[in-house]
């Protein structure tokens, strides 16, 4: 039994079904062209030493598909600085912070529920969202490990904030706002 040799072919196109395949001319020679493949979106090699943010690589789908977290509607997208000002300032209503990402499926579902909640609690709660990719360091400081992550912050500074992670039902959000804040 002969061992297959691994060879790199810079001019070979990327395989259609797998990352490697056997050459029909030389059945024991494995062609592996992943290392030479230039990504058409990034216009550079996939193994470049240059680093890019996840947001530049993972573009959100077109708005026409409907499956996209909108930048602003009723629940406003805010920065880390805006959140810090909201937390330090005096409020008469609870603050709900949604840490999300545009590529996150559960975040898209949660965004729809939060928009409904924003209509329902229009003057009784302040709901904002933070893009965890745009505000990576702030999300890390807030111990966001999974998405979506919600923080429910009471207007009473003596009450602890409530943190949830993952998709939660709208009724649970109502219960937290009505009973725990």
From Swiss-Prot:
Record's subcellular location: Plastid, Chloroplast
Keyword Electron transport: yes
EC number(s) from the headed UniProt entry: 1.8.-.-
Transit peptide, from-to: 1-70
Signal peptide interval: none
Enzyme class: oxidoreductase
GO molecular function: protein-disulfide reductase activity
Disulphide bonds in the chain: 104-107
Domain of life: Eukaryota
InterPro entries xref list: CITRX, Thioredoxin-like_sf, Thioredoxin_domain
Site positions for Contributes to redox potential value: 105-106
Start and end residues of each Thioredoxin domain: 71-181
Any GO CC annotation of this UniProt entry: thylakoid
Alphabetic keyword roster: Chloroplast, Disulfide bond, Electron transport, Oxidoreductase, Plastid, Redox-active center, Transit peptide, Transport
Annotated catalytic residues: 104 (nucleophile), 107 (nucleophile)
CDD domains, sorted: TRX_family
Any single GO BP term: plastid organization
Sequence segments annotated as region (Disordered): 1-20
Record-linked PANTHER family: THIOREDOXIN-LIKE PROTEIN CITRX, CHLOROPLASTIC
Family: Belongs to the thioredoxin family. Plant CITRX-type subfamily.
Function: Probable thiol-disulfide oxidoreductase that may play a role in proper chloroplast development.
Name of this chain's protein: Thioredoxin-like protein CITRX1, chloroplastic
Source organism of this protein record: Nicotiana benthamiana
Gene this chain is encoded by: CITRX1
């Amino acid at each position: 039994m002969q061992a297959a040799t691994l060879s790199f072919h810079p001019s070979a196109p990327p395989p259609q079904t797998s990352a490697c395949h056997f050459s029909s001319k030389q059945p024991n020679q494995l062609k592996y062209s992943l290392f030479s493949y230039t990504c058409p979106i990034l216009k550079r090699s996939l193994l470049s030493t240059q680093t890019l943010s996840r947001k530049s690589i993972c573009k959100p789908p077109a708005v026409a598909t409907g499956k996209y977290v909108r930048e602003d509607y009723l629940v406003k997208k805010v920065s880390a600085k805006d959140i810090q000002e909201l937390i330090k300032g005096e409020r008469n209503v609870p603050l709900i912070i949604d840490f999300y990402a545009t590529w996150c499926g559960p975040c898209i579902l949660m965004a729809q529920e939060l928009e409904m909640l924003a209509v329902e609690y229009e003057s009784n709660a302040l709901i904002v969202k933070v893009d965890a990719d745009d505000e990576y360091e702030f999300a890390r400081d807030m111990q966001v490990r999974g998405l979506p992550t919600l923080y429910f912050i009471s207007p009473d500074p003596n009450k602890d904030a409530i943190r949830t992670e993952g998709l939660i039902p709208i009724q649970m959000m109502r219960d937290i706002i009505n009973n725990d804040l």
